[in-house]
């Protein structure tokens, strides 16, 4: 599911969102994509109830606003829904905490995305490959 955030309400931003949804549909025809306005909570919740994945690609819940979330209706969470987050600070967002409390079994935080962005940035800045396995051991150590 892809949801449109009103932070950047330009035609270019909207076009980009729709193009990404179309590209995803072409790459994975069996994957249904839905673009909806985050301000329409009824549509958002109905869409989540029909989805296999909920991925927050906004900054809602990121420090210093850790107590914010896009989801205020806990009934949309279910055990088999996969909940993912691109935010890595805080490590566990309110959305992730709420999903866990509601019984969601598969919850993924944003540290993996941060790691792989770092891999690409390292290569861009140094021209060398980052020692990913070494960094993973340090980065994901509890």
Per-segment meaning from a language model:
Residues 8, 65-74, 137-142:
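Short, surface-exposed, charge-dense and proline/glycine-enriched linear segments
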Residues 30-107:
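Rossmann-like adenosine-cofactor binding region
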Residues 1-49, 53:
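Glycine-rich phosphate/diphosphate-binding loop of Rossmann-like nucleotide-binding domains
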Residues 10-13, 17, 64, 92, ...:
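Alpha-helix N-cap/helix-start motif
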Residues 24-27, 59, 126:
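Generic detector of bulky aromatic hydrophobic side chains
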Residues 7-8, 62, 115:
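Surface-exposed, flexible loop/turn segments at secondary-structure boundaries
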Residues 82, 86-142:
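Adenosine-phosphate binding glycine-rich loop
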